[in-house]
């Protein structure tokens, strides 16, 4: 057997295609549903972390103004009817409520981390309030 000279061939850069299994081939040959592309989804937690960073940077109020105002008026009705509020008073209340909630959630998160969890639970909020002396 005589040796022959081998010539260089252009490489495609990939592996040789493998034979498909019968079930895969049947699936691929089945008619597609109009070529509808699935919407892009991020991994669980990615969007949550992005929102956390965004809200930590921002300083604007996160509770909508009108629903908060309705809630304040509804609670005030239990104490005295026909109470009037200045818009600045409602704004000051909303600022303090949001500051309180942010602080409570920070303490709640510390309680969850102490319990070696990353998800806050009702018992974490209860513990945080108890440690603050707000609830006996």
From Swiss-Prot:
A Pfam family it matches: Histone
GO MF, one annotated term: DNA binding
Xref: InterPro entries: Histone-fold, Histone_H2A/H2B/H3, Histone_H3/CENP-A
CDD domains with a match to the protein in the record: HFD_H3
Modified residues (N6,N6-dimethyllysine): 5, 15, 28, 37, 80
Residue numbers carrying N6-acetyllysine: 10, 15, 19, 24, 28, 37, 57, 65
PANTHER family, A to Z: HISTONE H3
Name of the featured protein: Histone H3.1/H3.2
Species of the source: Scheffersomyces stipitis (strain ATCC 58785 / CBS 6054 / NBRC 10063 / NRRL Y-11545)
